[in-house]
Amino acid sequence: MGTVMTVLGPVPASELGAVTMHEHLHLDQYAEAEGTTPPERVALLRDCAIPALRRLHDHGCHTLVDATPMPMRAEPWVYAMLAREANLHIVLATGFYREAWERESWEYAGCPTYPHRWMDPRVAAWDVEALADLLVQECEQGIRGSDVRAGIIKLASTRTAFTPLEEKAFRAGALAQRRTGLCITTHVEPGLEPLASPVAQLDLLEAAGADPSRVILGHVQPHLVRLPGEVRQCLDRGASLCITNLQAEGNDSYWRAVVDAIRRLFDAGFGDRLTLGLDWAFDNVTGPFVSCSWMPLPPYVYLFTHVLPRWKEFGLTDEEVTQILVRNPARLLPRV
């Protein structure tokens, strides 16, 4: 099975248990560079995140993938502290976010002010090879001079058409994936109309040399229902999916349609390519740094206490849940 790089070092994939594959422990929407994590944020994470993370073990979940890119992350030591105190495996990302290149995308997120961009300024200043070197350094040597190493590469885009800086970041991520053997996990924008294309991301990554079997296309929950042809095309080419932003309350007909789409993918032989995450975050999207503004409580464990019980009522089986949460992450997260 191989080993997975966590913030406390390598862990055998057989020890991961269930894995929630796309979360955020510290998401600073206004950061322009990575600096010191304010002590009040660390206190919030100690008081609110750690109890929720400990509860994950009650459901057989021993691993969380933090998909937060530069410069939105906390200091590396914060993740190591959370992992130790929650006794949880945390896989931390390296990588770059998308550009807030149109006011609509910023206002959709509920942010009170409109910045120039979300993307790390080094993407504009450095060439593709230097950016790839930075990603590889964080994976193989450590993040910001620490011994905390990244275990996955995060990339993001806003629309089907990439901005020049988004394309540059994707090319750097593809180079880093080839050099490290780690998976790429992406942000396919799920909230703006028309829906962004996961195929466009896969096209660019493949053209830049990435292995499609090491690509996880993220936030594709609405695509399962509305763009099933695009989803199937990505799966046919070897990619995996991360289905996120999951809720248990309200709109039963829609969530039943999501579960039906997942079960059809199992029937078509693609059950080994599916993963789940909430996209839960402690963040400052509305100004102050607080609990997630777009997902219900409780943090992280909501997937197990609310979503999966409801989805099982809609027909998802225990065997399918085990495949999605245990076997698939154990295959995807080790470097190859």
Residue ranges and their predicted role:
Residues 174, 178-266, 273-274:
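Catalytic pocket-lining loop regions of alpha/beta-barrel enzymes
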Residues 81-85, 89-91, 95-183, 240, ...:
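Active-site gating/metal-coordination segments in enzymes
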Residues 185-188, 244, 270-293:
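Short acidic/histidine-rich active-site segments
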Residues 29-33, 76, 102-104, 194-203, ...:
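Histidine/acidic-residue-rich catalytic or RNA/ligand-binding cores of hydrolases
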Residues 2-9, 298-336:
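Mid-to-C-terminal alpha-helical segments outside catalytic/metal-binding sites
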Residues 23-47, 55, 98-129, 149, ...:
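Active-site gating loops and adjacent loop-to-helix segments of metal-dependent hydrolytic enzymes
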Residues 17-21, 26, 34-89, 129-148:
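Alpha-helical scaffold segments that flank or form the walls of functional sites
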